[in-house]
């Protein structure tokens, strides 16, 4: 089978009415799956449905009550939800429009042309154009293709992985990466103040300012997710339930719904909120705050009639030079014990990967004991 045939886009374009069994989710997951468009319409029509908080952070730039209210609103959302719709983010609409247009133009190219940027996870090359071909802990594949690469700092990026076509892709991605880096600092300041800490605390901890000789910048990884039309959205997912390893994740989309977050024991569909971007709290920030801010469990659904694209920027600490552990000031009164052992970001990623592999082995063993075939 060629690389082109392995892409989910090719499978979708083939006109299949059923999906291969490797994409069919385990039976226990299917009860609340469905078409992303239909679930979003139902959520919008039901005022009683839980709604992800919307916070305008432009008030943070002012003194007085507005600034304090902004900090409190972000704090509450990060503690109770782990996800926020951010308005007043300062990202110009024309930049976001150009970014979306460039990503859509890349994924509109023939698959064979996109293959020039193909990654090779088996060889350790994670960046580039790819599909989630390796089975997850569930033993199933995800209904998505993607483009993934470092977008900031620019001097560390491998620009050979940035598409030359469309020509706009490189300049607008570079511009966007720099702007999100500025936004990340602002949000980390707000989140620090929400904990009663000096506003530079969380960023200093993520960049290693507390360690002698260490002052690395945060790394921003851009992933464009492409979710093709799926004939059976009641059986498949674009991205299975997970938390992000990052400190913060920033999400834009093409207007097609699909994001769901887990809150108060159930899945909540993210409603369209014009003019906002979605921000997730990730594992690294949950560790630093000793669980005060919640790394949100989320997933991506697919649709029978619409293609969904999302642009996700993962804001991460340097992989090995920074030790992630709860901020000491949050433990100072002795009332709280550290919930997380110290680890580097690289160690945390490896730990999550090991746990997934162990889950896969346990699932395989259980299936084998029941006389089922395993992959």
UniProtKB/Swiss-Prot annotation:
Binding locations of 2-oxoglutarate: 308
Keyword entries, A-Z: Dioxygenase, Flavonoid biosynthesis, Iron, Metal-binding, Oxidoreductase, Vitamin C
Induction of its expression: Induced by light.
Top-level taxonomic group: Eukaryota
Keyword Repeat in annotation: no
UniProt GO BP: anthocyanin-containing compound biosynthetic process
Pathway linked to the protein: Pigment biosynthesis; anthocyanin biosynthesis
Similarity comment text for this entry: Belongs to the iron/ascorbate-dependent oxidoreductase family.
Function statement: Involved in anthocyanin and protoanthocyanidin biosynthesis by catalyzing the oxidation of leucoanthocyanidins into anthocyanidins.
Name the UniProt record assigns to this protein: Leucoanthocyanidin dioxygenase 1
């Amino acid at each position: 089978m060629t690389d082109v045939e392995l892409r989910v886009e090719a499978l979708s374009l083939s006109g299949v009415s059923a999906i291969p069994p490797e994409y069919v989710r385990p039976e226990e997951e299917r009860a609340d799956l469905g078409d992303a468009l239909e679930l979003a319409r139902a959520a919008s029509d039901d005022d009683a449905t839980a709604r992800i908080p919307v916070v305008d952070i432009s008030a943070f730039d002012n003194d007085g009550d507005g600034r304090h209210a902004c900090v409190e609103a972000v704090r509450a959302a990060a503690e109770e939800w782990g996800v926020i719709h951010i308005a007043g983010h300062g990202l110009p609409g024309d930049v976001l429009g150009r970014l979306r247009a460039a990503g859509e133009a890349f994924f509109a190219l023939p698959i064979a042309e996109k293959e020039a940027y193909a990654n090779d996870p088996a060889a350790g090359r994670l960046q580039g154009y790819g599909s989630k071909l390796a089975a997850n802990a569930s033993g199933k594949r995800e209904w998505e293709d993607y483009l993934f690469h470092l977008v900031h700092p620019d001097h560390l990026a491998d620009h050979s992985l940035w598409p030359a076509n469309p020509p706009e892709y490189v300049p607008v991605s570079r511009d966007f990466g720099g702007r999100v880096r500025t936004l990340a600092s602002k949000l980390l300041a707000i989140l620090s103040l929400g904990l009663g800490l000096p506003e530079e605390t969380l960023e200093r901890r993520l960049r290693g300012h507390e360690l002698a000789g260490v002052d690395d910048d945060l790394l921003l990884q851009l992933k464009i997710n492409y979710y093709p039309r799926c004939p059976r959205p009641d059986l498949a997912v674009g991205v299975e339930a997970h938390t992000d390893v990052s400190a913060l994740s920033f999400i834009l989309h093409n207007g097609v719904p699909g994001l769901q977050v887990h809150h108060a024991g159930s899945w909540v569909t993210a409603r369209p909120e014009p003019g906002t971007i979605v921000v997730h709290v990730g594992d690294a920030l949950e560790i630093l705050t000793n669980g005060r801010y919640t790394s949100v469990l989320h997933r991506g659904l697919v649709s029978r009639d619409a293609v969904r694209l999302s642009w996700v920027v993962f804001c991460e600490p340097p992989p090995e030079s920074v030790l992630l552990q709860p901020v000491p000031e949050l433990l100072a009164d002795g009332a709280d014990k550290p919930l997380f052992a110290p680890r580097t970001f690289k160690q945390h990623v490896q730990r999550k990967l090991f746990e997934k592999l162990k889950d896969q082995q346990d699932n395989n063993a259980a299936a084998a004991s029941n006389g089922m075939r395993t992959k």
